């Protein structure tokens, strides 16, 4: 069963039921998640201690093979990192990407309150890390300079992905 992600993040009482933040100081899984995020372009030039502090606010979810993570049209609430497993991203039944450990997706939701543009399904047992927009906004309030750097990194990532999509469309015309 897949719960509505939008409900989980807009109602704090519901968030406690459906989402758990399992990280604690010194947790080795937190260190792994921190390193995986640091290996992405989103956290380029963000100091490790600040990345780790932000990662400590993130949420873990386990999915079974075949379980829907989100569907096209669902309200986006944040980006998702594949900690372990595999995720298929598709739109109109066409595969857009097959993601593995360390890959991230759904980052549009960090920048805009838009609906998901694709479907995401676990193709194997998967552990995912949710980086919610509301957590990013709180972090930016406390760390505005680093927040500006992060938003520049996010903008560059979105621009690169848009460019790649445009190139793919141009080849098909």
Could you describe each region identified by the protein language model?
Residues 1-173:
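Cytosolic regulatory regions built on CNB/CRP/Popeye-like sensor folds
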């Amino acid at each position: 069963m897949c719960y509505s992600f939008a409900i989980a993040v807009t109602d704090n009482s519901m968030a406690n039921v459906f989402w758990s933040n399992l990280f604690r100081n010194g947790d080795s899984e937190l260190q792994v998640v921190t390193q995986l995020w640091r290996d992405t372009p989103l956290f380029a030039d963000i100091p490790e201690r600040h990345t780790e502090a932000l990662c400590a606010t993130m949420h873990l979810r386990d999915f079974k093979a075949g379980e829907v993570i989100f569907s096209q049209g669902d309200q986006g609430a944040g980006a998702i990192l594949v900690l372990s497993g595999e995720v298929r991203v598709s739109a109109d039944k066409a595969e857009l990407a097959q993601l593995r450990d360390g890959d991230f997706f759904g980052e549009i939701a960090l920048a805009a309150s838009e609906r998901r543009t694709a479907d995401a399904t676990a193709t194997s047992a998967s552990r995912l890390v949710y980086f919610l927009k509301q957590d990013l906004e709180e972090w930016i309030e406390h760390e505005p300079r680093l927040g500006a750097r992060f938003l520049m990194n996010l903008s560059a990532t979105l621009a690169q992905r848009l460019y790649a999509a445009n190139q793919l469309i141009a080849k098909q015309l």
